[in-house]
């Protein structure tokens, strides 16, 4: 599919873009109020930090990538720290593919909320996949934000290690500062590696392109695809091979669309398992 045509469809008046389910993912950010969830999202999308605090009800963003000739869609769901609607919280978890749980190092209550959230994610996902929570694989990182306020720290390192466990493939922990932009790139790289997604999705590993440069992006994507077909590389992780565009006016999908998304993902996972069972060694 031509990337120029793709970007034209990103306007709200046009129909939804059709990208294969295997290339569509959703990143969900969860945590208490005032821990810095929106600041992390802002760093991810724009590289900027907004010092003013505005309470989030629920913010939805969408980003498209061209990576080595493939087009990817990443939805970003910035959830509310207050959850008056448990059903919506559960739906957010069900539709999530990768998770960032955020607490503030200077707020013990927010750490305890992350403990509850992690358990809720494991319980919800294990129910969906018909597995025990010990066996369900959910790409998840826990972030202790406000590392620049270490003097006011209320959470002990040993408690964090106990929560995270000793398997970095299941859960990773990062102490970050969204304000100082500290350790965020490493955190995103680890999360995408855990989910087996292209590392170029991390903000520091692709070029940011605005919508008005879609023709340039399309030409570069075609060039990279031709190089790949010719066996000339393109898979080395060079930022020149990857481009990202934040979709303007992205709208949260309807509940019906979310339910269809869950169904499609579950069906794709089931088919992959069936293929594994049919392999003759």
Swiss-Prot record:
Domain of life from the UniProt record: Eukaryota
Keywords: Cell membrane, Cytoplasm, GTP-binding, Lipoprotein, Membrane, Methylation, Nucleotide-binding, Nucleus, Prenylation, S-nitrosylation
Propeptide: 279-281
Gene3D superfamilies, per database record: P-loop containing nucleotide triphosphate hydrolases
Subcellular localization: Cell membrane; Cytoplasm, Perinuclear region; Nucleus
Cysteine methyl ester: residues carrying this PTM: 278
GO BP annotations listed: G protein-coupled receptor signaling pathway; negative regulation of DNA-templated transcription; nitric oxide mediated signal transduction; signal transduction
S-farnesyl cysteine lipid attachment residues: 278
Topology with respect to the bilayer: Lipid-anchor
Tissue-wise expression: Expressed in a variety of tissues including heart, cardiovascular tissues, brain, placenta, lung, liver, skeletal muscle, kidney, pancreas, gastrointestinal and reproductive tissues.
Family as reported in the entry's similarity comment: Belongs to the small GTPase superfamily. RasD family.
Protein's UniProt name: Dexamethasone-induced Ras-related protein 1
Species this protein is from: Homo sapiens
Gene designation per UniProt: RASD1
């Amino acid at each position: 599919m031509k990337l120029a045509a793709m970007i034209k469809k990103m306007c709200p008046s046009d129909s939804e873009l059709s990208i294969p389910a295997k290339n569509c993912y959703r990143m969900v950010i969860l945590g208490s109020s005032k821990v810095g969830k929106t600041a992390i999202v802002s760093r991810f999308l724009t590289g900027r930090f907004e010092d003013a605090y505005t309470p989030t009800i629920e913010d939805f963003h969408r980003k498209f990538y061209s990576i080595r000739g493939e087009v990817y869609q990443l939805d970003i769901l910035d959830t509310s720290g207050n959850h008056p609607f448990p059903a919506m919280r559960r739906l957010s978890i069900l539709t999530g593919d990768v998770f960032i749980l955020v607490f503030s190092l200077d707020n013990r209550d927010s750490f305890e909320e992350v403990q509850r959230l992690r358990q809720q994610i494991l319980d919800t996902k294990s129910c969906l996949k018909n597995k025990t929570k010990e066996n369900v694989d959910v790409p998840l990182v826990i972030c202790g934000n406000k590392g620049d306020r270490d003097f006011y720290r209320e959470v002990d390192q040993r408690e964090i290690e106990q929560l995270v466990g000793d398997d970095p493939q299941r859960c990773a922990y990062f102490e970050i500062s969204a304000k100082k932009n500290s350790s965020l790139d490493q955190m995103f790289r680890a999360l995408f590696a855990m989910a087996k997604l292209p590392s170029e999705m991390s903000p520091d590993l692709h070029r940011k392109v605005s919508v008005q440069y879609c023709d340039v992006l399309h030409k570069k994507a075609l060039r990279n695809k031709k190089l790949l077909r010719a066996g000339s590389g393109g898979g080395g992780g060079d930022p020149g091979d990857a481009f990202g565009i934040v979709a303007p006016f992205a709208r949260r999908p309807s509940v019906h669309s979310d339910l269809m998304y869950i169904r499609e993902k579950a069906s794709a996972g089931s088919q992959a398992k069936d293929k594994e069972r049919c392999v003759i060694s």
